[in-house]
Amino acid sequence: MSRWYELCDSLGLYVMDEADIEEHGLRGTLASTPDWYAAFMDRAVRMAERDKNYPSIVMWSMGNESGYGPNFAAISAWLHDFDPTRPVHYEGAQGVDGNPDPKTVDVISRFYTRVKQEYLNPGIAEGEDKERAENARWERLLEIAERTNDDRPVMTSEYAHSMGNALGNFKEYWDEIYSNPRMLGGFI
């Protein structure tokens, strides 16, 4: 990994360094379980200690799609104390009812947000188009950025996933990203 970061340093590429914490299917169970605290902290601390001197790393990410709980709040507090110069990101932070974007993260992040409303195919009856119900789950990135009750930057941490011929809509994504100064961009 160090060679990659050295290349990013020399080429001027920005990196979001992510701890390897991912628990698909468990919906935050481990993030809220004290027995997992040490394992969560170990991954984040080792990442930050290992990579702290690479100027290409502009942001720490606590993990991905693992729900939210006290273990992530503790990681965020540690990262902010260890390195107050870099923002802290975590895509799964929106998992808390009533507090979808806790202040323990510095960046609001979603994956696979949708862009234009017409992609929902509103003229098709429910059930006729399997994609319609699936697409309706995802928030629209621009709507998140236009919320006035929060001034943190907004980004899509995963988008344009390439499965079948699904890769695309780059122009539509970037038109929306460029339309609002709170938008940071995204990761493919």
Please give the residue ranges for each predicted region.
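Substrate-binding/catalytic cleft of secreted carbohydrate-active enzymes
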Residues: 1-188
